Amino acid sequence: MTFRHCVAVDLGASSGRVMLARYDSKHRTLTLREIHRFVNCLQKTDGFDTWDIDSLEKDIRLGLKKVCNEGILIDSIGIDTWGVDYVLLDKQGQRVGLPVSYRDNRTTGIMPQALVQIGKSEIYRRSGIQFLPFNTIYQLRALTKQQPELTAQVAHALLMPDYFSYRLTGEMNWEYTNATTTQLVNINTDDWDDTLLAWTGAKKGWFGRPSHPGNVIGDWICPQGNRIPVVAVASHDTASAVIASPLANKHSAYLSSGTWSLMGFESKMPYTTDEALAANITNEGGAEGRYRVLKNIMGLWLLQRVLKERRITDLPALIAQTEALPACRFLINPNDDRFINPDDMRAEIQAACRETDQPVPVSDAELARCIFDSLALLYADILHELANLRGEKFTQLHIVGGGCQNALLNQLCADACGIRVMAGPVEASTLGNIGIQLMTLDELNNVDDFRQVISANYDLTTYIPNPDSEIARHVAQFQPKRQTKELCA
């Protein structure tokens, strides 16, 4: 078959898309077309920040039906989402309650309990995952302690992409790359860790053994009656994004830039040393047995909140105003946990500047400048941490995802990090999702083969560092800004 048509469902914390890919195996060309885009936002339910899971499923099905109604024969479907959140099911496979968002405050104070009762080193030795207060391990502990009556009804727990695959196929699956984000998978066995799971109060029977990307979960029957295989892709969106990052060699790092920024490198071995623990490095699962050694950064969430609060719709105009402002007048630590979900992001940023005896950003452009400068300096700091961890410097940084369209931030990143930045592709998560589908259909050999397809089909933008820039001169001064309560213990 010359042409393949694969559908990627890519759900982010603020929006979702159903994308159609067309792959010409003879010429190795790959094109994407957006079929359906929809909003994903939090809602308050019984005092919790929850996801409108039924609305998301409705939009997924609508997007799939749109493809089928065009007369296109779909070869496969794959679903990727954000990590750590889950859906509870009863014995009949029906949903129990609504999935609570990782941004809900129910996990406040839970992680310190684990550090005392299990031990930080022991948790890290078992999982290799960074300490974030909203990891699934702490969410489940909050669930079982705070809602025992709900817990009693539970027979299964599915992570978000696995739930949507289940709703399409009727088959349950626990995909490995996303499962590792829970901090509940043992890094040595690739299975759920009995000790960590027991601490949460959740039953091991809620979960099946994690499966690696590339297996067919089951079939979705389209309106025309065709059975379409649903593939377990690298269902954590960052895992998919890394697959589509055209990393040149071992000296290349990646930055998946969106609501969250995830900076790291690929490795065939995990890093679980005391140094890695001290730096709060995570070893999330990747495709083909690779590890995604990385750190979570709050990312463009801060900007998204400011845009929403200030009702700003013209982002390019705001960036143009921001670029005209002097650099580094206002600096914050974007990873300070005060920015996870404040009532008023603008006021929180201003308070952080005021508390550190800095000028206070007032205009929208000043707020954006504060966010961009601070992110770029944090990127540089973390890239330095990662280089020290592996004992080798990086020579190139690949920025992928929606954030790579921000030319100002890309240049600031290049200047602060002091290395060449390659930006693109924008639709990295979707493309990585498609890549695993094409491998499952035997159209591609492996991840490296797929990256050659990406390099041939998608243009990258290069940013050369300017060592004389204002932000480059502030790199050494930024470290004290990070002496705040970060997203870790």
UniProtKB/Swiss-Prot annotation:
EC code: 2.7.1.5
Names of required cofactors: Mg(2+)
Coiled coil: none
Active site: D237 (proton acceptor)
MF term (GO), any: ATP binding
Keywords for the protein's UniProt record, in alphabetical order: ATP-binding, Disulfide bond, Kinase, Magnesium, Nucleotide-binding, Rhamnose metabolism, Transferase
Keyword Disulfide bond: yes
CDD domains: ASKHA_NBD_FGGY_RhaB-like
Disulfide bonds: C68-C222, C353-C370, C413-C417
Record-linked InterPro entries: ATPase_NBD, FGGY_C, FGGY_N, Rhamnulokinase
Single biological process term from Gene Ontology: glycerol metabolic process
Residues given in the record as ATP binding sites: A13, S14, S15, G16, R17, T259, Q304, G402
Pathway: Carbohydrate degradation; L-rhamnose degradation; glycerone phosphate from L-rhamnose: step 2/3
Binding site for substrate: G83, H236, D237, T238, N296
Reactions that this protein is recorded to catalyse: L-rhamnulose + ATP = L-rhamnulose 1-phosphate + ADP + H(+)
A GO cellular component entry from the record: cytosol
SUPFAM superfamilies per record: Actin-like ATPase domain
Protein origin, superkingdom: Bacteria
Function: Involved in the catabolism of L-rhamnose (6-deoxy-L-mannose). Catalyzes the transfer of the gamma-phosphate group from ATP to the 1-hydroxyl group of L-rhamnulose to yield L-rhamnulose 1-phosphate.
NCBIfam families: PRK10640.1 (NF007925), rhamnulo_kin (TIGR02627)
Matching HAMAP family: Rhamnulokinase
Entry similarity comment: Belongs to the rhamnulokinase family.
Name of this chain's protein: Rhamnulokinase
Gene (name only): rhaB
